[in-house]
Regions:
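C-terminal helical cap(s) of enzyme catalytic domains, especially alpha/beta-barrels
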Residues: 95, 99, 150, 174, ...
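Glycine/Thr-rich beta-alpha phosphate-binding loop at enzyme active sites
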Residues: 34, 119-149, 195-196
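Expand to "…catalyze enediolate/carbanion chemistry for C-C bond making/breaking, isomerization
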Residues: 74, 80-82, 97, 101-110, ...
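Glycine-rich phosphate-binding active-site loops on the catalytic face of alpha/beta enzymes
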Residues: 78-90, 131-141, 176-200
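Catalytic cores of alpha/beta
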Residues: 64-76, 114-126, 154-155, 165-183
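Catalytic beta/alpha-barrel core
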Residues: 8, 28-37, 55-63, 79-90, ...
Length: 208
């Protein structure tokens, strides 16, 4: 089971500081949506240059111009790029085609999908690498129940789970059996991010 840390609402200085102390313990480094908007893809390039072996995910949440955005992300050093399932299958497939061109991967985010179970089944059959079951920061509901239903229909894609995951509920999340767990503010809003990352990793080891 993998730990993905999403770096969104924080300064570049703090982002870089956390990576310096904990890059070896983060399985997937997520350059989050807010980082993309605030700092652009140039800083992603710098992260790639500094950490050539890191598994980097960039989260532009593609809805439009899929080929141009995906190409820019992969050329900036991303290993994985995100697209929204609500953008439609055709748009998602355009991102997948660009990913294949670069030998990279795609994560489809199911956030706000009105029919997530059927959508997940179709995306899985279409050959997408990752599917993310996700509740937004404005939604206080846990993504766990939806994840368990989607897990029943997905055969091949790697299932990710995100939204409100903390050290208080991590064991319950781990027992659901995702491929990777996505955490963010619970790490970078803590006074000791490295300690929190280490604790998350311990829980993943205990339960797998």
């Amino acid at each position: 089971m993998k730990l993905q840390v999403a770096f969104d609402d924080l300064s570049l200085e703090k982002l870089d500081s956390i990576l310096e102390t904990s890059i070896q313990d983060i399985d997937i480094v997520e350059y989050g949506t807010l980082s993309v908007i605030r700092y652009g893809l140039n800083h992603l390039k710098e992260i790639r240059e500094k950490y050539p072996n890191a598994n980097l995910l960039v989260d532009p949440k593609i809805m439009d111009a899929p080929e141009k955005i995906a190409r820019s992300c992969y050329e900036s050093g991303a290993d994985i790029c995100t697209v929204m399932s609500v953008a439609g299958l055709k748009t998602c497939l355009k991102v997948l085609n660009i990913a294949k061109e670069y030998g990279k991967e795609v994560m489809v985010d199911l956030l706000n999908d009105l029919d997530p179970i059927n959508t997940a089944k179709k995306l899985d059959e279409a050959g997408f690498d990752y599917l993310c079951v996700h509740s937004s920061t404005s939604d206080k509901n846990s993504p766990l129940n939806e994840f368990l239903e989607i897990k029943k229909v997905v055969k091949n894609a790697k299932l990710s789970i995100a939204g409100g995951i903390s050290l208080e509920n991590i064991d319950e999340i781990v027992k659901a059996g995702p491929y990777n767990i996505i955490v963010g503010s619970s790490v970078y809003n803590n006074e000791n991010p490295k300690l929190v990352i280490d604790k998350f990793k311990e829980h993943l080891k205990w339960n797998t």
